């Protein structure tokens, strides 16, 4: 014969059992931290790189947040010969990619969750002119934009930089991919090709018929940052937390200098004439980042005057 149990006593027993089980079970966040997060990307090295700068910085931010967010692994998409930023944006929107690094533009704001923080320190907006070595003496003498606009210039078609030049009344010859610019210079299709100050020497050192001009550069405010798939907000938050940690300990500046500092120093940026352009496609909110993330010259000559205007 079973002993009758009052409903109130039963309810208390059930509550105590549930509470005990909860104490013995790990919390949800602990379970998620023990899982390995897979991050899909397609950050392939550019011409002149051994490893993509974007991937190097992404690894830093992810490593900084292992203690708070758990382990991770990268899954790189198979290498493709004709990958473009436009193709990567399509894959980000479709879920084929979790994260990509790209120059910011108003047109790209809705393509993913924006993670503010320029991983190139604004140096992607300082463009160094590259030309045939046989024409160096002729082209070093450019003094202002009026003279520069008389030169025929080329950019890769899917780079937002091409649109920046066009919106500053500088007609641009668009080429389909970076790998053909040296051959087209040799054929006389255009006078100069503009490369970012943190990549130009790494690319041109393997092209003996070309030189990076020494006397002038084209400058405009520009940020180059991570975008995350809209379905991965937790990854975006993790990267933002990583940025805060690197700003606090200086590890990003050290990593950036190790990766591309030699190219920036070889460019002698302070000694050049800066031909400054507007960038109407630059999202203004992307400029509101920690001052330490900018290269000092970019901050002094481009960003601070713009923010004070």
Task: Describe the residue ranges of each PLM region.
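N-terminal export signals
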Residues: 2-7, 14-31
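Extracytoplasmic small-molecule ligand-binding "clamshell" domains
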Residues: 32-111, 239
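Periplasmic-binding protein-like
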Residues: 43-44, 51, 123-128, 132-135, ...
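Short helices/loops that flank or line small-molecule/ion binding pockets
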Residues: 78-98, 167, 179-194, 198
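A ligand-binding cleft/hinge motif common to bilobed small-molecule-binding domains
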Residues: 91-93, 100-112, 191-218
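A conserved helix-loop-strand patch within extracytoplasmic ligand-binding domains
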Residues: 118-163
